Structures are given as C-alpha cells and as structure tokens.
C-alpha cells in the first residue's frame, strides 16, 4: 500500500528567515543536529526555543510521529516517542503521521530505514541547490507492505534488540580502546 494511503505527510516548519533563540519563545524546534542517523534517535535537551509565526498547516510533534530526513546525502526516519510540548520539526524533515490503524509506527519507522527504500529514494529524489532532496510525492509513493500486526510487532521488537546490541558493541569498543590506550601509555612511560 502506498505511504500516502496509510499516513499523512507534512513538511516541517518553514521559516521566512533565520530562527533566533528566545528565552520567552513559545515553541521548540527539532533540527537536523538533534537527530542521529547512526542511532536512529533524537535528543530534546538542546532544542531551540523560539517564537514562530504559525500557520494552520504546522504540526506539533507527538508520540507516534515519524521524522523523515528529506534533505542531505542520507535519508532516514526516526520514531518520536517522548518529547516536551510545542515541538515543531524543522524544514529539513517531513513529519509522517499514521492515519491507518493497520500499521504500527515502530514498524513503519523501521521499514523506511531499509535498503530497498534507500535505493528507491536515490533513484527518484531530486537535487536541491546544494544537496539531494526527497520530494514529498516521491515519499508518498513508497509502497509499504502491511503484514499482520503480530508480525509488525515482532519486527519492531527485533529491531529494538538490534539497536541495543549495536549500542552495546559501540560502548564495548570504546572501553576496549581506552583500556588498550591506557596500557600502551603506561608501557611507554614506564620503559625504564
């Protein structure tokens, strides 16, 4: 089933100029720097507080939304689960909001990050002034398989376990590097 048949897709907040942080701001802005392509995650501790000029088309992010990075060399999606109130996505994102109860957000987020989708996007995406850009129509036309909810749940759980495993391997590699570096430094300093 086409993505636009199971979800609504909205562009991120488009500003008429530079966004300036303001302590008295009414909204927070999630930007590209706030998401991680490696971990497929996001952080909210450094969101910019600002005062937008909202239109009726702007969506505040909510749990279950999927942020899709539409600009740049690497397109990926991140599932939103917890976040503060009044958070807008920046213009570099599309916000994908499920409108069909036959699909789980976790499953859709996972599927949009798979290599067949990456290849499809490379083939059909356009080029912006300075970088590749995924057009909304291209994103909307992605075919999404709809297995039973039980299967979607299983796929989502396996993906969560895989992410945890990858995070543990990275932490282990960092600790090993620090240990071996320490051993080598100690050996070079105590060569007498």
Regions found by a protein language model. Name each.
Residues 87-92, 126-153:
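A short glycine-rich beta-alpha junction/loop motif
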Residues 20-27, 46-47, 59-61, 79-91:
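Short, surface-exposed loop/turn microsegments at beta-strand edges and helix-strand junctions
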Residues 4-18, 33-63:
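Sequence-specific dsDNA recognition surfaces
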Residues 55-56, 83, 129:
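A structural connector/turn signal
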Residues 1-19, 24-25, 146-192:
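Non-catalytic DNA-recognition/assembly elements of restriction-modification systems
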Residues 70-111:
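A short beta-sheet element
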Residues 65-68:
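Generic structural signal for buried aliphatic residues
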Residues 102-138:
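Short, positively charged
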């Amino acid at each position: 089933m086409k993505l636009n048949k199971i979800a609504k897709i909205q562009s991120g907040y488009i500003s008429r100029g530079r966004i300036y942080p303001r302590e008295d701001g009414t909204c927070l802005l999630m930007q590209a720097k706030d998401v991680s392509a490696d971990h497929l995650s996001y952080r909210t501790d450094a969101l910019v507080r600002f005062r937008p000029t909202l239109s009726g088309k702007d969506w505040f992010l909510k749990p279950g939304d999927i942020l899709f990075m539409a600009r740049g060399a690497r397109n990926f999606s991140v599932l939103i689960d917890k976040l503060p109130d009044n958070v807008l996505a920046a213009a570099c994102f599309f916000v994908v909001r499920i409108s069909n109860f036959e699909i789980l957000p976790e499953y859709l987020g996972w599927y949009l990050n798979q290599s067949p989708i990456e290849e499809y996007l490379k083939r059909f995406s356009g080029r912006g002034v300075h970088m590749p850009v995924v057009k909304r129509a291209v994103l909307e036309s992605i075919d999404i398989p709809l297995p039973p909810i039980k299967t979607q749940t299983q796929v989502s759980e396996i993906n969560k376990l895989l992410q945890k495993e990858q995070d543990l391997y990275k932490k282990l590699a960092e600790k090993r590097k620090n240990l071996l570096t320490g051993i080598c430094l100690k050996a070079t300093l105590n060569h007498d």
